[in-house]
Design a protein with these regions (language model features):
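Surface-exposed, charge/polar-rich loops and edge strands
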Residues: 1-408
Length: 408
């Protein structure tokens, strides 16, 4: 396994590149969510359709798994008396560390943040006034300490609002840097999935942006099992791979929440599992390995390291892994499993849970493109060449693909 792992760690990121002209990057969404084009890859062949036809492409008995995370208004702007503008980008909660508890805080909380124009914020606190409902409130920010390249910021505010309400009233929704534009009012709606509900992401799980409530209802009526999980998407999603080989790239940690109900349904798998987006893929695959860790007697199964999936025992079935997690739910008398993953999925990885995925078209030399390569092998070249030569739109607001995982 050490030799195989070394081979995977030595994958060169330049082998996963392609030329993406700027005009192929969708700067704005189409007028209708389901109007996007859909590339279908199955049995090694490529077909083209419209996303509105998804209701006819999926079959009764299949399980369709969505990430129900909701993008927060993570960008906060403070203007100093000197006129300098300080941007504080909220990355993840620090105190309380639990997302739900942090958003429910009524007077203060702490977050791990990135700060723009930090050189203009030498000392002291900064504040901004904002309107929520018909009243005006004040949000104050102060630096607590630096930690691993980020700043821990303590927020405090007046009026008894929850921090969720503070962000809604004071913050702006983030948009990917590669769009090269500020967020607009339309992004408030279109940069959220129609099924989003669990606050915590600073980027949307964009594969789900194409789904409408009508499509979801049609799929349910058809007998497709629609299921949900939560993974909060961090800013690390946009971080480029700067290392020459993927073994020298550090993945970001992502927080996930899984219900007992979903684990039990995965244990009783009766049809194909189709993940909506790479975040759902990483969550489902991480869940399998967490079950394997518990089977191996490891108490820290709540966390999954970047390369652990390649060093753990490889011969457990999905059912066995899910049974191990069901045992934890029973013992702990819990209905939710809260965990963290830094899993990296690269070509050579064998998918244990999913059979297919919906995903948009990703940036060159990205870990997301490696994840696609793990699913379809060298055919990723064929898929992306087809998309480029057939007028598909790329990245967050771009078109979609339905990729069947090649089974070795």
């Amino acid at each position: 396994m050490d030799r195989e792992l070394d081979k995977l760690r030595n994958i060169r990121i330049e082998d996963y590149t392609y030329n993406l002209p700027d005009e192929r990057i969708a700067k704005f969404p189409l007028a209708e969510r389901e109007a996007s084009k859909l590339l279908i890859y199955r049995g090694g062949r490529i077909e083209e359709s419209r996303f509105s036809e998804v209701r006819h492409l999926l079959r009764a008995g299949q399980m369709l798994v969505f990430n129900n995370t909701k993008v927060i208004h993570a960008r906060l702007f403070f203007r100093k008396a000197t006129g300098a503008v300080i941007e504080v980008f909220c990355l993840e909660p620090y105190l309380p560390v639990d997302y739900a508890q942090n958003f429910a805080a009524r007077d203060s909380c702490e977050w791990s943040c990135m700060v723009g124009n930090l050189k203009k914020w030498k000392e002291g606190s900064i504040a901004c006034d904002f309107t929520y409902g018909e009243a005006t409130y004040r949000l104050t920010a102060e630096k607590v300490r630096q930690q691993e390249g980020e700043l821990i910021i303590r927020f405090s505010w007046t009026g008894g609002l929850s921090f969720s309400e503070v962000l809604e009233g004071c913050g702006r929704i983030p948009s990917p840097l590669y769009l090269n534009r500020e967020s607009e009012a339309s992004d408030e709606v279109r940069y959220q999935t129609v099924y989003s509900k669990e606050e915590g992401s600073v980027a949307a799980p964009t594969a789900g942006l194409h789904f409408t409530r009508a499509i979801l209802n049609d799929l349910k009526e058809k007998g497709v099992h629609v299921r949900e999980l939560t993974l909060h998407v961090g800013a690390g999603t946009f971080r480029p791979v700067k290392a020459e080989t993927i073994g020298d790239h550090d993945m970001h940690t992502e927080h996930l929440v899984i219900s007992r109900e979903l684990v039990e349904q995965l244990k009783e798998k009766t049809g194909d599992i189709v993940a909506v987006g790479t975040t759902s893929v990483r969550t489902l695959e991480s869940l399998y390995w967490m079950g394997v860790k518990r089977l191996a007697g490891q108490e820290d199964f709540f966390t999954l390291g970047q390369w652990e999936a390649y060093t753990l025992p490889q011969d457990y079935s999905l059912r066995e892994a899910m049974e191990a997690l069901c045992g934890w739910f029973d013992t702990a008398c819990q209905e939710l499993l809260k965990a963290r993953t830094t899993i990296i999925i690269v070509p050579g990885y064998r998918y244990r849970v999913i059979d297919a995925m919906f995903t948009n078209f990703h940036q060159p030399q990205s870990t997301l493109l490696l994840l696609v390569g793990a699913a379809v092998g060298e055919d990723w070249h064929k898929i992306y060449d087809y998309a480029l030569t057939h007028d598909f739109r790329f990245l967050s607001y771009g078109d979609s693909s339905l990729l069947e995982v090649k089974k070795s």
